[in-house]
Amino acid sequence: GKAAEQYKAKAYADMRELLEDPNVDAVAIATCNHWHCLAAIWAMEAGKDVYVEKPLSHSQWEGRQVVNAARKYKKIVQLGTQQRSDPMQAEVKKFLHEDQALGKVLYAQANRLGPRGSIGKRETPLPIPQEIDYDTWLGPAQDEPLYRNSFHYDWHWDWNTGSGEMGNWGVHVLDDVRNVAYQDSVTTPKRILSCGGRVAWNDAGDSPNVHYVYFDTGSF
């Protein structure tokens, strides 16, 4: 494929072939979202440590299977919320908690604002690019016709393969709150209020592009 032509690293069409290589100690999983959990579990079963991009899963159940596998196979697994490595977050935590510069924190709010254009809406299904092994690309996802204009990237806004903006950027900003404000002591929410929708565009996307979520954790 194009990647094999551009880079000198060995290329694989099927990740399972890579996982069989005993010389590989760890893998970074940067597939489409719908593959994250299964690929991570396969890697751990093969004895590899894992860095898996966010979002980890489509559901709590899927995510728990990855946690269970990490404990079963005693492997290191890191989720791709890379802003935790930013020294600024440590400074903000010190500002809030050690210095108590703002006093007692009672409430935390995260916002993500960014323009996102229409992905289009075709009258006929999108032809799959010839260079794509579509069965392998789909993996655990449903085989459904695609009506968006572009095959690549815009799978984010299809619940079958993506997780919408909440799974794309929401993961990052919510993890910032969990890390900085809660210091990872946040409990499972007692109540969740979620509202929003797909506004402005009548396109093929089925995930919200405007989304408000309130988590009542009772942690503060």
PLM regions and their residue ranges:
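A contiguous active-site-proximal alpha/beta segment in oxidoreductase catalytic domains
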Residues: 49-51, 57-136
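Short, solvent-exposed loop/turn elements at domain surfaces
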Residues: 2, 21, 116-119, 145-147, ...
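N-terminal glycine-/serine-/threonine-rich beta1-alpha1-beta2 phosphate-ribose binding loop
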Residues: 1-52, 58-76
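Rossmann-like dinucleotide-binding domain that binds NAD(P)(H)
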Residues: 135-220
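N-terminal Rossmann-like dinucleotide-binding module
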Residues: 1-7, 83-86, 177
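Residues embedded in well-ordered beta-strands within globular domains across many folds
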Residues: 28, 106-109, 138, 193
